[in-house]
Amino acid sequence: DKCVRAVAKRFTGVEHRIELVRELNGVKYYNDSKGTNPDAAIKAVQAMVTPTVVIGGGYDKGSEFDLYVKAFKDRVKLLVLIGQTSDKIEATAKKYGFTNIIKAESLKEVVDICAENAKDGDAVLLSPACASWGMFDNYEQRGRLFKEYVNAL
């Protein structure tokens, strides 16, 4: 019992799964690059307890994004999109009245946009709801680059 509690206290989570990268200027940056489908990304969005800037988009596996966008209600203040699905996710978001959207060309640009728009007390969440292919070799590479860019801020 004592041993289990000690291990639980030291456990920092699993890489790329709602992983806290750092807190900077009161903004917490989370890497959930493993959120490669809408269902996984919804769970990450629902785990956020402060206003959140969500980074979404990537390779189009034919997913629908209606439930993903509906999960934004009263949680997400800005959606920053990247990759092949940018237009599809943007159209779905606008269909449900969510219009605070910025599109970017690179992950570095995404991180810079998030840093400019997130305020003290906010969270920034990379939970793309899409595969990484096309821009990255895999979700691990995408997540590690995200962490590198965030740590360089």
Which residue ranges define each predicted feature?
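Phosphate-binding loop of NTP-binding sites
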Residues: 134, 147-153
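Phosphate- and divalent-cation-binding pockets in alpha/beta enzyme and binding domains
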Residues: 40, 88-91, 135
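A short acidic, helix-capping loop that chelates divalent metal ions and anchors anionic groups
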Residues: 27-28, 132-135
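C-terminal helical cap/extension that packs against the catalytic core
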Residues: 66-122
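Short beta-strands and strand-loop turn motifs
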Residues: 125-129
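Nucleotide phosphate-binding/pyrophosphate-handling subdomain across enzymes
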Residues: 1-76
